[in-house]
Amino acid sequence: MTKDKIAKDSYRKLLYFFENKIWVHFKDFDKIFYNGLIIDLNEDKMTMVIQERVRGEFPFLLECVNPDSIAKFNEGGN
């Protein structure tokens, strides 16, 4: 899968969480996971910024997000 295709798939899946202000859980391709609220999602630049409770704000290139790992964050593993 190309980086452009990965970025577009990630954007499409993350848009729902961004528009509805739902906490999201995802992993990058190094299998590091992130949980947070998306505070910025840019389709032109294919970037996003999430706000995590503990670590603060993180910028991401959407090509680095594994689109298959994107899901609603369930606090406490429920």
Task: Please name every model-derived segment.
Residues L41-T47, E75:
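Short, conserved beta-turn/loop elements at beta-strand boundaries and strand-helix junctions
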Residues V49-Q51:
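Beta-strand residues in well-ordered beta-sheet regions across diverse protein folds
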Residues M1-N35, R53-N78:
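Short glycine-rich, low-complexity segments
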